[in-house]
Amino acid sequence: MNEAKFRTWLEKHMNYHTARTYTARCMRIEEKLFIDLDDEYRKDGGSGLLNRLKYSRDEQRQRKQPQCGLKFEENADIYIGMNSLGASVKKYFEFRGTED
């Protein structure tokens, strides 16, 4: 992941703190899933990873942990957490699309 370029690109579209949050979420995905977002983008435009990051309200009601393997604290809202992570990764893939 090209952290610096991504953050600079984000700052053109949103405020500094939001850009840092999106970047940190993407870094968390890379670290916890042992992947590189650039590799995922090259593989299939990121669609495989985005599918792995999907988490439904039904899964939340059933108290299921995410299938991708990410762990959350006991009282965390996993649905919101997973959707925030997915939105950040989707934004990274959007950024990558502007570089091609």
Tell what function each PLM region has.
Residues 14-99:
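Non-catalytic DNA-binding core/recognition domains of DNA-processing enzymes
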